[in-house]
């Protein structure tokens, strides 16, 4: 073989974008199997990918064959990336990826010319017999199929590559060229074409709607090409023993960029029986309209996430039980998906920012209506509680809920004695307790309320949970630096116990 390109994961000049693109190339080579582009050799190892061809095959023709085998269209004119391993019957997942790519890598019509009238695909949740119709723009071709904007396949080069090639926005979404075009070697630009394969794209539906981000491109930091190629193709599978969270359209709809990244990382590692991970973490690139450019989608913010967090189990529980998506109708009568709960978004953002997992939880229950909705979050809050590792958090929640249980018992006795509505008594007491927690402004005030709440529940006797962790609890609750955390934990303890009640009433259905 006269022409040979070796892309090494250890290349010191590579950024996380290069490594993600190399992961996309690795997954594509794996998908080729023995059906490689004619005249092209391909080799995949843990730390490199090798491409080669003979002198009798011009470089431009070799590239055309590589692109033709890597970037395709389905019969329904949706983008097809063989490297991601999406099956023909997964139209809803392909729809999410198609719309995501068109909104990020290929946001300009000239990069994906196609039909003017949108086509429709039915999307339904696991619980729905009939779904809603979601739309997409069918494309006749897209930029990656012919390396559009790079200059690699210009006729004037007569079969050869240029000395330098351009890096258009379709290759690296959000890339800004400024006065001068971004350029690199032909080999590097060819590699970056596979960034769209190596990344995962999610559709963002922020809870506050103040954040105008619409998409999230998750860029993995890859350390093992073979493992990553296997993992990214495994995500598209629908196994019965291993739960996947991002292998459907609805699974690609999340509240925040951090939630998207953690959901993708969990899916990457699911079912991997080896001790070695394929990635060390990722970048979550949120994209949307920004104030200084209303004409196109730009990067609105970027956050780096690690592969592991001490309390990642709490997010996993929130993601599994509260990470569902609801389908509503837009003003045009089309389907529109939104997250059913804001909790996974909040926990993911906290973990990524190295905040306490429960930080700002009070923003989710500060309004009475939000609080009432939260208490019916099925088994999700209970599962989160069981996943907590921190001893201080466990002690506070355990003590609060023991006191609340005794308070309920006293209210039950009162209801029986006086012929009152037990449910109404609980509702009033729960709301009174929520307001009392929210009104406290200092650690001392909250600690005093907490101790009085516990004492009232036992008519002056010490709670068993407090006796067991007396020193730990005392040290924690009187520390002013713990005030926000303490307040959020009390609110979480209240609503997660309320979740126990609602599940009991519903027969424990989750």
Predicted regions: what is each one?
Residues 1-112, 116, 125-128, 277-510:
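Long, contiguous all-alpha helical interaction modules
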Residues 166, 193, 396-400:
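A broad "ordered helical/assembly scaffold" signature
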Residues 88, 92-146, 153, 168-173, ...:
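Long Lys/Arg-rich low-complexity intrinsically disordered regions in nucleic-acid-associated proteins
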Residues 167-347:
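Domain-exit/linker segments immediately C-terminal to small folded modules
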Residues 138-144, 150-190, 461, 472-487, ...:
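Long amphipathic alpha-helical coiled-coil/heptad-repeat bundle
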């Amino acid at each position: 073989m006269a022409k040979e390109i070796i892309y090494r994961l250890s290349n010191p000049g590579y950024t996380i974008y290069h490594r993600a693109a190399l992961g996309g190339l690795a997954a594509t080579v794996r998908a080729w199997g023995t059906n490689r582009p004619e005249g092209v050799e391909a080799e995949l190892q843990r730390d490199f990918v090798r491409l080669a061809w003979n002198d009798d095959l011009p470089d431009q023709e070799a590239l055309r064959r590589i692109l033709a085998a890597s970037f395709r269209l389905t019969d329904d004119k949706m983008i097809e990336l063989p490297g991601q391993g999406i099956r023909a019957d997964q139209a809803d997942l392909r729809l999410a990826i198609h719309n995501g790519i068109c909104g990020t890598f290929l946001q300009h019509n000239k990069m994906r010319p196609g039909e003017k009238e949108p086509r429709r695909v039915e999307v339904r949740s696991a619980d729905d017999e009939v779904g809603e119709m979601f739309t997409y723009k069918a494309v006749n071709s897209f930029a990656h199929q012919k390396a559009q904007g790079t200059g690699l396949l210009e006729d004037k080069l007569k079969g050869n590559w240029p000395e330098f090639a351009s890096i258009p926005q379709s290759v690296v979404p959000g890339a800004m060229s400024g006065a001068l075009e971004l350029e690199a070697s032909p080999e590097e630009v060819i590699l970056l074409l596979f960034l769209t394969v190596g990344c995962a794209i999610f559709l963002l539906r922020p809870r506050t709607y103040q954040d105008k981000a619409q998409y999230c491109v998750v860029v993995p930091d890859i350390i093992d090409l073979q493992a990553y190629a296997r993992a990214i193709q495994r995500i598209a599978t629908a196994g019965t023993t291993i739960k996947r969270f991002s292998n459907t359209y609805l699974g690609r709809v999340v509240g925040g960029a951090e939630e998207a990244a953690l959901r993708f990382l969990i899916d990457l590692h699911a079912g991997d029986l080896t001790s070695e991970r394929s990635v060390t973490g990722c970048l979550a690139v949120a994209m949307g309209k920004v104030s200084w450019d209303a004409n196109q989608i730009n990067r609105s913010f970027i956050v780096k996430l690690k592969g592991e967090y001490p309390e990642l189990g709490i997010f996993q529980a929130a993601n599994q039980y509260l990470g569902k998506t609801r389908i509503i109708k837009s003003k045009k009568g089309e389907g529109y998906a939104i997250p059913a709960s804001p909790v996974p978004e909040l926990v993911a953002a906290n973990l990524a920012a190295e905040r306490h997992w429960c930080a700002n939880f009070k923003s989710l229950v500060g309004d009475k209506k939000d609080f009432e909705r939260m208490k019916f979050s099925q088994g999700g809050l209970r599962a989160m509680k069981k996943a907590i590792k921190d001893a201080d958090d466990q002690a506070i929640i355990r003590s609060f809920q023991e006191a609340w249980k005794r308070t309920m018992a006293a209210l039950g006795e009162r209801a029986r004695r006086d012929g009152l509505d037990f449910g109404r008594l609980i509702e009033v007491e729960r709301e009174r307790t929520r307001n009392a927690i929210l009104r406290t402004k200092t650690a001392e005030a909250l600690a005093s309320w907490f101790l009085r709440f516990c004492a009232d529940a036992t008519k002056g006797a010490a709670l068993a949970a407090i006796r067991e962790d007396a020193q730990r609890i005392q040290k924690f609750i009187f520390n002013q630096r713990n005030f926000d955390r303490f307040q959020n934990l009390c609110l979480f303890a209240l609503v997660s116990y309320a979740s126990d009640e609602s599940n009991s009433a519903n027969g424990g259905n989750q």
